[in-house]
């Protein structure tokens, strides 16, 4: 049975390709999932993807992945800057976690410069567009070796 990576996308990421394309580009969430899935397959891994606009669903997914997945790729969206509960869930999952941001939050508004999630992440990738998801999967695959 191949290892699984949990791919979590937070609030508003279902709007990729439609919302602020000058910041986030024209790629869709489906493109993100396809890219991550293809990269995982190169390493003999599978991806379980979830996008939710509800913090509790993301937390539940992290809890449920504990002990069953090899790692997590997460783009928490706006929860990055506000959610201690999501940080605690990342820690509780005990999964190596890579935080991904399509844009560079440090080149944007001041409130976006802080990430709670990065306190528990093994790596943070920002500003690489959706390629950041591919890089994140590669990082987790190499940690597994």
From Swiss-Prot:
**One GO MF term, please?**
3-dehydroquinate dehydratase activity
Answer yes or no on keyword ATP-binding: no
Q: Alphabetically, which GO biological process terms does the record hold?
A: amino acid biosynthetic process; aromatic amino acid family biosynthetic process; chorismate biosynthetic process; quinate catabolic process
Top EC class, one word: lyase
Protein keywords? Amino-acid biosynthesis, Aromatic amino acid biosynthesis, Lyase
Q: What does this protein do?
A: Catalyzes a trans-dehydration via an enolate intermediate.
Return the EC number.
4.2.1.10
Q: Which reaction does this enzyme catalyse, per its entry?
A: 3-dehydroquinate = 3-dehydroshikimate + H2O
Site Transition state stabilizer — annotated at 19
Q: Which InterPro entries match?
A: DHquinase_II, DHquinase_II_CS, DHquinase_II_sf
Instruction: Identify one Pfam family in the record.
Output: DHquinase_II
Q: Which residues form the active site?
A: 24 (proton acceptor), 101 (proton donor)
Q: Which family does it belong to?
A: Belongs to the type-II 3-dehydroquinase family.
Task: Summarize the subunit comment.
Answer: Homododecamer.
| Gene of this entry | aroQ
- Do you know which CDD domains this protein is assigned to? DHQase_II (cd00466)
Give the record's pathway: Metabolic intermediate biosynthesis; chorismate biosynthesis; chorismate from D-erythrose 4-phosphate and phosphoenolpyruvate: step 3/7
**NCBIfam families linked:** aroQ, PRK05395.1-2, PRK05395.1-3, PRK05395.1-4
For binding substrate, which residues are annotated in this chain's numbering? 75, 81, 88, 102-103, 112
Full protein name:
3-dehydroquinate dehydratase
Record keyword Amino-acid biosynthesis present: yes
């Amino acid at each position: 049975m191949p290892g699984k990576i949990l791919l979590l996308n937070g609030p508003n990421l279902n709007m990729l390709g439609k919302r602020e394309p000058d910041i986030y580009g024209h790629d869709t969430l489906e493109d993100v999932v396809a890219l991550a899935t293809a990269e995982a397959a190169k390493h003999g891994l599978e991806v379980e993807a979830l996008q939710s606009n509800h913090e509790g669903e993301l937390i539940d997914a992290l809890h449920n992945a504990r002990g069953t997945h090899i790692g997590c790729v997460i783009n928490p969206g706006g929860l990055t800057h506000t959610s201690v509960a999501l940080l605690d869930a990342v820690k509780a999952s005990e999964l190596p976690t890579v935080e991904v941001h399509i844009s560079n939050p440090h080149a944007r508004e001041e409130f976006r410069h802080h990430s709670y999630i990065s306190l528990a992440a093994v790596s943070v990738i920002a500003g690489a567009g959706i390629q950041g998801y591919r890089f994140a999967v590669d990082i987790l695959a190499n940690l597994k070796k």
